[in-house]
């Protein structure tokens, strides 16, 4: 009987512990992690490693994620492997829905955007950059040339140092 009571008590303790919020600097946390009136720092010493470890989580889901091994930040929702280790560029940033920033120091924001070129930026809906130092903004725009810019609706800047603006221009 004592063993049964002990097991029930331990079970209730674990159940209660899992349901509580954590507070740093507060005795009354309002969320799972609550740090009131303060800054938060996530850091790692030195430069990124030559062989980065796995991401904190992979696959589909909603998340906000700092991946220290690649100094990369992600926030939003993905439905597949967009934010898995091989689709995250060193020093990159991606936010929104179905975004991928796989290029070195690249940025992808919006819905279904992909920035695969080194230091490239893709913003909007269905935009893509594959050229180095390229920019795609708007709806379904593509900047594939080096240092190219595509802006507007369904524009493509495929030549190096090219610019395409407006609607359905190349």
Predicted regions and their residues:
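C-terminal trimerization/auto-chaperone modules of long, extracellular attachment fibers and adhesins
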Residues: 4, 10, 18-170
């Amino acid at each position: 009987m004592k063993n049964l009571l002990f097991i029930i008590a331990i079970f209730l303790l674990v159940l209660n512990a899992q349901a509580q919020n954590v507070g740093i600097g507060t005795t009354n946390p309002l969320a799972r992690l609550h740090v009131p009136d303060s800054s938060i720092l996530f850091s790692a010493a030195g430069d990124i490693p030559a062989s980065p470890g796995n991401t904190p989580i992979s696959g589909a889901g909603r998340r906000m994620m700092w991946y220290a091994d690649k100094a990369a930040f992600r926030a939003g929702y993905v439905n597949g492997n967009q934010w898995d280790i091989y689709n995250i560029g060193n020093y990159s940033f991606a936010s929104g829905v179905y975004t991928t920033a796989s290029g070195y120091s690249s940025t992808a924001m919006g819905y279904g955007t992909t920035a695969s070129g080194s230091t490239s930026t893709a913003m909007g809906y269905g935009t893509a950059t594959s050229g180095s130092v390229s920019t795609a903004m708007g709806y379904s725009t593509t900047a594939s040339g080096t240092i190219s810019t595509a802006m507007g609706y369904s524009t493509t800047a495929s030549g190096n140092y090219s610019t395409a603006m407006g609607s359905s221009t190349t």
